[in-house]
């Protein structure tokens, strides 16, 4: 449920501008071992043999210049034609066109796959035209399959289509670039917003001294971090929580940090829609949640039917306990399905002598599963929110991997194991979305 709150006309406010260069990650200092230092010392002709003693101070050779491989050169950054082409795109959306052009040129990619979420497909053809114009000899391919989130990165299809590089827009690096099957470039698409209105609205609705936990999608992550010092100067205490390995402040629809209700007064979500916020609300049922929509510039109080959701999921788990035959669905939409999680559940079923069937699906619909009526329980390794949000619409129980392990007696129920809080940690470091091969052996005979 959404309850709008008082807005503000956003009076003029002095806000310090933060240089974009301050947000750039600085290169880590390289550790120089003793063996390397000795080698440099021997090559330095300016150091005489008299000075090379255990107690003498030796002059260290100057560090080499930093690597420039990933730095966009001025001839691309300052190219007036490229800048003119970028003007065709919204000014407050950072599609990082110069960075993409540089990556295509330096990698020598000849066929580039572009993957967008539904909301950004409107800009796909424009970006495609810009890249092909400034990267002669390069062909672009727009991937049209639905992209729900960071888990849907489709490097397998891009590789099958003969692409050399995949550019994935508007999601974080949930699947690391050293794991993807082809070279991958993540573009977060930072979105700039008018923060003065947000600050004025918060000041009008909340008393100074409140502790606010700020979260959002990756597009607004830079804004969240920029807001922290401004809100603190206004008298608020600001916490930007993290659930590793996600970035600080970033949440997904299936993964969000669990906060202490005694330390946090307000959970503030920056973004449009409720899908991601609901993850944080499920994981923090006692903390009041608010959503600021930067497009409509409204602040609303958000609520969630925790009791109803818990009752539906308990009923599905209890029904699954008596199922004679199970079905295991491995999601094939991008990287949604984890084969190791599937193997782990298979091992537990085999250990208990429960027959099962495996099914590979890109999208899961009730009608598809209803045609296999002999299967009395399904567990889907794709998106936990599909079961949580839509499980009631399926003719048989549709469990998440976590719920399946509860039904099989492998894990404790959230009522006893997590103080009644349903966990939202699917892509956390030890979450079931990241099951490793050795963990898949659990339950094996």
From Swiss-Prot:
Reactions it catalyzes: L-histidyl-[translation elongation factor 2] + S-adenosyl-L-methionine = 2-[(3S)-amino-3-carboxypropyl]-L-histidyl-[translation elongation factor 2] + S-methyl-5'-thioadenosine + H(+)
Covalent S-S links between cysteines: none
Residues reported in the UniProt entry to bind [4Fe-4S] cluster: 151, 254, 383
Localisation: Cytoplasm
Cofactor note: Binds 1 [4Fe-4S] cluster per subunit. The cluster is coordinated with 3 cysteines and an exchangeable S-adenosyl-L-methionine.
One GO BP annotation of this record: protein histidyl modification to diphthamide
Primary localization: cytoplasm
Entry GO CC: 2-(3-amino-3-carboxypropyl)histidine synthase complex; cytoplasm
Top enzyme class: transferase
Region named Disordered: 1-74
GO-annotated molecular function: 2-(3-amino-3-carboxypropyl)histidine synthase activity; 4 iron, 4 sulfur cluster binding; metal ion binding
Record-linked Pfam families: Diphthamide_syn
Keyword vocabulary terms for this entry: Cytoplasm, Iron, Iron-sulfur, Metal-binding, S-adenosyl-L-methionine, Transferase
EC number: 2.5.1.108
UniProt cofactor(s): [4Fe-4S] cluster
Pathway where it operates: Protein modification; peptidyl-diphthamide biosynthesis
Subunit structure as annotated in this protein's UniProt entry: Component of the 2-(3-amino-3-carboxypropyl)histidine synthase complex composed of DPH1, DPH2, DPH3 and a NADH-dependent reductase, predominantly CBR1.
Family the entry assigns: Belongs to the DPH1/DPH2 family. DPH1 subfamily.
Annotated function: Catalyzes the first step of diphthamide biosynthesis, a post-translational modification of histidine which occurs in elongation factor 2. DPH1 and DPH2 transfer a 3-amino-3-carboxypropyl (ACP) group from S-adenosyl-L-methionine (SAM) to a histidine residue, the reaction is assisted by a reduction system comprising DPH3 and a NADH-dependent reductase, predominantly CBR1.
NCBIfam families (alphabetical): diphth2_R
Protein name: 2-(3-amino-3-carboxypropyl)histidine synthase subunit 1
Taxonomic placement: Eukaryota, Fungi, Dikarya, Ascomycota, Pezizomycotina
């Amino acid at each position: 449920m959404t309850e709008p709150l008082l807005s503000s006309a956003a009076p003029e406010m002095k806000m310090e501008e933060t240089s974009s260069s301050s947000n750039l990650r600085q290169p880590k200092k390289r550790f120089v071992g003793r063996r390397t230092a000795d080698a440099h010392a021997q090559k330095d002709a300016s150091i005489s043999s008299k000075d090379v003693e255990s107690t003498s101070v030796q002059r260290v050779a100057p560090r080499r210049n930093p690597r420039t491989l990933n730095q966009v050169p001025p001839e691309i950054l300052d190219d007036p034609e490229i800048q003119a082409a970028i003007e065709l795109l919204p000014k407050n959306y950072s599609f990082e066109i110069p960075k993409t052009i540089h990556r295509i040129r330096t990698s020598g990619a000849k066929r580039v796959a572009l993957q967008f979420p539904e909301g950004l497909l409107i800009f796909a053809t424009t970006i495609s035209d810009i890249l092909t114009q400034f990267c002669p000899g390069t062909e672009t391919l727009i991937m049209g399959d639905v992209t729900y989130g960071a888990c849907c990165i489709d490097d397998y299809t891009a590789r099958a289509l003969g692409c050399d590089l995949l550019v994935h827009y508007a999601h974080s690096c949930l699947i690391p670039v050293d794991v993807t099957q082809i070279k991958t470039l993540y573009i977060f698409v930072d979105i700039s917003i008018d923060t003065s209105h947000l600050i004025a609205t918060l000041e009008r609705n909340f008393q100074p001294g409140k502790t606010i936990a700020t979260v959002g999608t990756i597009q607004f992550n830079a804004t969240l971090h920029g807001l922290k010092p401004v809100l603190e100067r206004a008298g608020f205490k600001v916490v930007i929580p993290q659930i590793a390995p996600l970035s600080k402040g970033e949440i997904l629809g299936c993964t969000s940090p669990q906060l202490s209700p005694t330390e946090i007064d307000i959970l503030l979500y920056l973004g449009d829609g409720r899908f991601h916020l609901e993850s944080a609300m499920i994981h923090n049922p006692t903390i009041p949640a608010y959503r600021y929509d930067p497009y409509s510039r409204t602040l609303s109080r958000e609520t969630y039917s925790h009791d109803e959701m818990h009752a539906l999921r308990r009923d599905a788990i209890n029904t699954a306990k008596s199922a004679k035959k199970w079905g295991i669905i491995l999601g094939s939409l991008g990287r949604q399905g984890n084969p190791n999680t599937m193997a782990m559940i298979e091992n537990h079923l085999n250990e208990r002598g429960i027959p099962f069937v495996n099914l590979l699906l890109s999208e899961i619909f009730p009608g598809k599963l209803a045609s296999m009526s002999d299967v009395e329980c399904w567990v889907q390794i794709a998106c936990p929110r599909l079961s949580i949000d839509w499980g009631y619409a399926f003719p048989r129980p549709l469990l998440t991997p976590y719920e399946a392990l509860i039904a099989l007696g492998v894990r404790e129920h959230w009522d006893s194991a997590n103080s009644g809080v349903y966990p939202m940690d699917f892509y956390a470091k030890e979450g079931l979305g990241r099951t490793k091969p050795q963990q898949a052996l659990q339950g094996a005979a």
